[in-house]
């Protein structure tokens, strides 16, 4: 009799995705981040669900309800900090996952890559709206500044901003709709992740060499299930160390002050995972230009597959491209640092240079490095 997991309509899908899936035998730990992102998403949905049971999306009570969760709800403090720091872990995994894709040429799977970029954008929007919910100073001013950017869109800008706000300023209507969107978007992300996986399984996984691995495949279970469990344990260990020892390490002290429209904080800045994009936004003196640069900082990833000039897929055997890639990583770290600094003399110039370098590396230096390598190998 054939095994039920191979015949049952529902089990068959699970079997083909997680058990009998033919997988390259040489994929490294850089391939663990996909499953880690899945775990992060499940964790965020579960902790978020329990937070939503006690949270109130009203401007007068939102801040107090978060305080109530931390003080009065059983284990509310750990749920709240797991959710807040879970977002940080989510973005660490996202950046590693995208970096892996860039390094090993996984972007040549066009559909998978483009859905991945859409997933990144959706996750960023979800995290932004979540940051508004505690209704602290940085929540309020972050929402005001970031939504106001849309007013730079010619002709319809102002109307668009007021439509998003549900009034003439960030107020009760804004908070309520942000809560509604923040609740629904993770489920949309989960659905998109399924499509992401569907397209990936059409082609099979890439591997560190970038060479077709059809001749050397192994079943996903038990080899990669056990590897994913190890990754998950390390992820949860890191998250719990953060939650239990320094839960506010990555947060902003200003968010422990209730939102006050009459008092602007001295330095408005987003959470650490948006600082690189924020630095790019601020580096352009023109409002519309800044907004376009901000959008392009993520959308530029969609151009990467078309700029692939190398005859090899992966960067594993391409030392010049490797140097360019790690320069990009260093540049992103510099942008992250600049995004958290005030708009003053040395920081402004560094931010502008780092922003120019970011686009230059992706759009010019990477294709040039690939072409040089092709010529060196007489290809």
Curated annotation (Swiss-Prot):
Cofactor(s) annotated in UniProt: heme b
Stretches that traverse the bilayer: 33-53, 77-98, 113-133, 178-198, 226-246, 288-308, 320-340, 347-367
Reported function: Component of the ubiquinol-cytochrome c reductase complex (complex III or cytochrome b-c1 complex) that is part of the mitochondrial respiratory chain. The b-c1 complex mediates electron transfer from ubiquinol to cytochrome c. Contributes to the generation of a proton gradient across the mitochondrial membrane that is then used for ATP synthesis.
Comment field (misc): Heme 1 (or BL or b562) is low-potential and absorbs at about 562 nm, and heme 2 (or BH or b566) is high-potential and absorbs at about 566 nm.
UniProt subunit comment: The cytochrome bc1 complex contains 11 subunits: 3 respiratory subunits (MT-CYB, CYC1 and UQCRFS1), 2 core proteins (UQCRC1 and UQCRC2) and 6 low-molecular weight proteins (UQCRH/QCR6, UQCRB/QCR7, UQCRQ/QCR8, UQCR10/QCR9, UQCR11/QCR10 and a cleavage product of UQCRFS1). This cytochrome bc1 complex then forms a dimer.
Domain of life: Eukaryota
Record keyword Iron present: yes
Organism the protein comes from: Oreamnos americanus (Mountain goat)
UniProt binding sites for heme b b562: 83, 182
Binding-site list for a ubiquinone: 201
Membrane topology: Multi-pass membrane protein
Protein name, UniProt field: Cytochrome b
Subcellular location: Mitochondrion inner membrane
Protein keywords: Electron transport, Heme, Iron, Membrane, Metal-binding, Mitochondrion, Mitochondrion inner membrane, Respiratory chain, Transmembrane, Transmembrane helix, Transport, Ubiquinone
GO cellular component: mitochondrial inner membrane; respiratory chain complex III
Biological process terms in GO annotation: mitochondrial electron transport, ubiquinol to cytochrome c
Keyword Hydrolase attributed: no
Residues the entry annotates as binding heme b b566: 97, 196
């Amino acid at each position: 009799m054939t095994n039920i997991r191979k015949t049952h309509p529902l089990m068959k899908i699970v079997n083909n995705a997680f058990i009998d899936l033919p997988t390259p035998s040489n994929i490294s730990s850089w391939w663990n981040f996909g499953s880690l992102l899945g775990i992060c998403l499940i964790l965020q949905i579960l902790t978020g669900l329990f937070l939503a049971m006690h949270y109130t999306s009203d401007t007068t009570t939102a801040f107090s309800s978060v305080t109530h969760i931390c003080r009065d709800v059983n284990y509310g403090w750990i749920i709240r900090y797991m959710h807040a720091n879970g977002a940080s872990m989510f973005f660490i995994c996202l950046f590693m996952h995208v970096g892996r894709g860039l390094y090993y040429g996984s972007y040549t799977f066009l559909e998978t890559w483009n859905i991945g970029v859409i997933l990144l954008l959706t996750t960023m929007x979800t995290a932004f709206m979540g940051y508004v919910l505690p209704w602290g100073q940085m929540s309020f001013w972050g929402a005001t500044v970031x939504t106001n950017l849309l007013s730079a869109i010619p002709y319809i800008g102002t109307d668009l901003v007021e439509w998003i706000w549900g009034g003439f300023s960030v107020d009760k209507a804004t908070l309520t709709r942000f809560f509604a969107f923040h609740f629904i978007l993770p489920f949309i992300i989960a659905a998109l992740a399924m499509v992401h996986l569907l397209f990936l399984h059409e082609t099979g996984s890439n591997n560190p060499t970038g060479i077709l691995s059809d001749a050397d495949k192994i079943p996903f279970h038990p080899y990669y299930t056990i590897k994913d469990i190890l990754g998950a344990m390390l992820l949860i260990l890191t998250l719990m160390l953060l939650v239990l020892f320094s839960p506010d390490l990555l947060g902003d002290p200003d968010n422990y002050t209730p939102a006050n429209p009459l008092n602007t904080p001295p330095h408005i800045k987003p959470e650490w995972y948006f600082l690189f994009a924020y630095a790019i936004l601020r580096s352009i003196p023109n409002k519309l230009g800044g907004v376009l640069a901000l959008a392009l900082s993520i959308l530029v990833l969609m151009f990467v597959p078309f700029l692939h000039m190398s005859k090899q897929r992966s960067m594993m055997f391409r030392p010049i491209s490797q140097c360019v890639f790690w320069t990009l990583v260093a540049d992103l770290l510099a942008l992250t640092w600049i995004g958290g600094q005030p708009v003053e003399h040395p920081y402004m110039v560094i931010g502008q240079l780092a922003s120019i370098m970011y686009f230059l590396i992706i759009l010019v230096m990477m294709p040039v490095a690939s072409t040089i390598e092709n010529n060196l190998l007489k290809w």
